[in-house]
Amino acid sequence: MRDRPYTLLSCSVSIDGYIAGVASRLLLSNDADFDRVDAVRASCDAILIGATTVRTDNPRLLVRSDARREERAARGLPESPMKVTVTRRAELDARADFFRVGDAEKLVYCASPWVAAARDRLGPVATVVDAGDNVEMRTLTTDLAARGVDRLMVEGGGTVHTQFLTEDIVDELQLTVAPIFIGDSEAPRFVRDGTFPWNPARRAELVEVQKLGDVVLLRYALSSRFQEAERGDGC
């Protein structure tokens, strides 16, 4: 068994690198890309988002296609993947769609000082896991692997993207670029400041460019595990 899941980071951005507006959500994808993302979700064992994304976007994180849900059920899997979120201070509402909608298992990784509060608030709707004082993503993914997660999809937001990428635990990046500009430095970006492994001396490998209506999918291999997965050698 691998010490962490094969990890795929998926994000939609504006041309100038933002993932949302300041005051409201923006539609950065189209129907073709939504369907592509749905297929990727259906192929994964778990989907991870940060607590801020749970609060601001209130996502359900479900597989939408009836056919894909049926195919998962036929394989003995839940209709949608496990939902995972990360929080430092347990500031989550148990009534959020993340917890309320769907039958998939829900995990909340929480910083040690706030675990008791998280279990009081979220215990009826999720499993709260003590993630240590610093909530490092490598430790989190090791725990997910021990729980049987072989393929993990990370869907935001910027802080979570930054943590996964700077810790060098992303195997594949799927970046959809929408034909709009945000033009506001206060808006959330794809990543925050950090020391990233990919630089002029270590360039990410672009493996696919796909036009999907008016958006473009850029697919990058960020580790050797990408080639292994593509060959079907396992994740």
Q: Can you name each region flagged by the protein language model?
A:
Residues 1-235:
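Enzymes that bind and transform nitrogen-containing heteroaromatic metabolites
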